[in-house]
């Protein structure tokens, strides 16, 4: 009964929160992504929420996540935990340096840097070194160990966000007769519970099923919740589900209105408990993992719900 509270206290806390937001004028009640159009849709990522960022392999999930880590931990000095069974700490540092210094990742990995890039790297590495980012790169980490480590570090370091890259690599030591669906269901439910217990937004990166070739090469193809891999529970327990889609990845270079889709990343917000489903287009540079909002003509989202923010 430790979490039982009088509704009066919760109401008073919420009213004070939205009064502060109203004075601020940006309409953001949670953690900013650093992407203006995304913040308009999400109003910031809320404490205790489970946010699923889904897409095909090598589509840009880690790049988007690390760009948010840079915004939260380096620009705003808020502690972040980044859990990656798929990348070593060194690879994460390489990618963060690329983002911070605006130097192509290939230049950093190869060491083939211009004089100006070396100067930028020195400044960027100093900023990264002093940032409150905590990396766990244990391969095959279990959900039990993850819960233990995250709970301890959140309490000790007041972490404001937790990123997990990616969900399908978190191990479950459940019933040996469980299917893969059962294992992922247990992991995602426990992550949602942990997010609520710690009152911190959790971002889980998730793989999706391979789309049919005809679907993927269709200029109006849109990712959908049923694309989530391994468990329908991901959709059920997530407070928000967003898909990353890159038409250019499937050799689609124009949409039906003639808009140029080269270097464009589309974010489809397919589930959003604090607002409508929506989509945005971002001008992206994956050499340095940068994402900027872009104005596009005739972009709409046939979601069955009207967009509260009109056409982007």
Describe each model-derived feature in a short phrase.
Residues 51-52, 81:
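Short hydrophobic/aromatic beta-strand immediately N-terminal to the Walker A/P-loop
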């Amino acid at each position: 009964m430790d979490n039982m509270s009088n509704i009066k206290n919760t109401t008073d806390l919420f009213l004070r929160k939205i009064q502060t937001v109203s004075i601020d004028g940006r309409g953001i009640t949670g953690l900013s992504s650093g992407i203006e159009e995304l913040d308009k849709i999400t109003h910031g990522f809320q404490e205790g929420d489970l946010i699923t960022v889904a897409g095909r392999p090598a589509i840009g999930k880690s790049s988007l996540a690390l760009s948010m880590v840079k915004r939260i931990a380096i620009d705003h000095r808020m502690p972040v935990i980044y859990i990656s069974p798929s990348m070593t700490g060194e690879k994460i540092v390489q990618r963060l340096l690329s983002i911070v210094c605006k130097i192509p990742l290939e230049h950093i990995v190869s060491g083939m840097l211009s004089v100006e890039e070396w100067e930028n790297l020195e400044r960027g590495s100093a900023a990264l070194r002093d940032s409150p980012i905590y990396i766990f790169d244990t391969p095959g980490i279990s959900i039990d160990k993850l819960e233990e480590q995250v709970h301890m570090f959140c309490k000790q370091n007041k972490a404001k966000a937790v990123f997990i890259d990616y969900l399908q690599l978190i191990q479950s030591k459940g019933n040996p007769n469980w299917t893969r669906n059962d294992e992922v269901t247990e992991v995602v439910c426990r992550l949602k519970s942990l997010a609520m217990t710690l009152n911190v937004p959790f971002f889980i990166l998730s793989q999706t099923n391979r789309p049919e070739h005809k679907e993927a090469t269709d200029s109006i193809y849109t990712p959908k919740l049923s694309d989530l891999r391994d468990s329908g529970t991901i959709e059920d327990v997530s407070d928000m589900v967003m898909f990353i889609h890159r038409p250019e990845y499937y050799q689609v270079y124009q949409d039906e209105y003639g808009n140029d889709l080269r270097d464009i990343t589309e974010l489809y917000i397919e589930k959003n408990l604090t607002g409508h489903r929506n989509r945005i287009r971002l001008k992206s540079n994956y050499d340095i993992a940068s994402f900027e909002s872009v104005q596009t003509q005739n972009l709409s989202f046939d979601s069955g719900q009207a967009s509260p923010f009109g056409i982007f």
